A protein has these predicted regions:
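Positively charged n-region of N-terminal signal peptides that target proteins for export
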Residues: 1-4
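Bacterial N-terminal signal peptides
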Residues: 8-22
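A short, N-terminal "cap"/entry segment at the start of jelly-roll beta-barrel domains
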Residues: 24-68, 150-165
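Conserved short histidine dyad/triad with adjacent acidic residue
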Residues: 56-57, 70-87
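Generic structural detector for well-ordered beta-strands
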Residues: 59-61, 75, 103, 111, ...
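Short glycine/proline-enriched turns and hinge-like loops at secondary-structure junctions
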Residues: 68, 86-87, 106, 130-132
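A short beta-strand-loop-beta hairpin characteristic of the jelly-roll/cupin
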Residues: 81, 86-114, 124
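Ligand-binding loop in jelly-roll beta-barrel domains
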Residues: 101, 108-109, 113-114, 122-150
């Protein structure tokens, strides 16, 4: 229970940091914090080339010269899911709401819930999405190997695979 509360506090802290931080004074000569205000970035509809069902991606931050990671909040409606994919450097998912499912190729489906953190190592084929009866939102953090390259998309997860058959 303490672990769950700690993880939930971490998730809330990440969202609060992204959405409510005070302004910074960044000059061209001095490195400093960059503040990206909650709601500044336009949500993206998940493409059917990469997702099954209704998925919304809310970009949180992009990789830049000082940092190779990028992050986004991804919301899956019930039954929606990613296609199979791999990350060249790995991925961290922080589930912030709902109930979801994730699976590594050749292994059983795992249920994930708000407060759970999923650490997917580099080059592990997997998928993730909402459970059949619940929406699910997670924060995804990935690292680029080259500009814009954080994922290699593969084939869709079939309905039979999603059902665990």
């Amino acid at each position: 229970m303490r672990r769950f509360i700690s993880l939930l506090a971490l998730c809330g802290g990440l969202l609060a940091a992204v959405c409510t931080t005070a302004p910074s004074t960044v000059s061209a000569r001095e490195p400093g914090q960059e503040i990206i205000r909650c709601g500044q970035q336009t949500p993206i509809k998940g493409s059917p080339r990469f997702f099954t069902g209704t998925v919304r991606i809310d970009p949180l931050y992009a990789a830049n010269n000082a940092m190779r990671s990028s992050g986004g909040s991804v919301t899956f409606e019930p039954g929606s899911r990613s296609h199979w994919h791999i990350h060249p450097v790995g991925q961290v998912l922080i589930v912030t709401a709902g109930v979801g499912l994730t699976q590594e190729w050749g292994k059983p489906i795992q249920e994930i819930r708000a407060g759970d953190v999923v650490i997917c190592p580099a080059k592990v084929k997997h998928w993730h999405g909402a459970a059949p009866g619940s929406a699910m939102t997670h924060i995804s953090i990935c690292e680029e190997t080259e500009p814009g390259k954080v994922v290699e998309w593969l084939e869709p997860v079939t309905d039979s695979q999603y059902a665990g058959r």
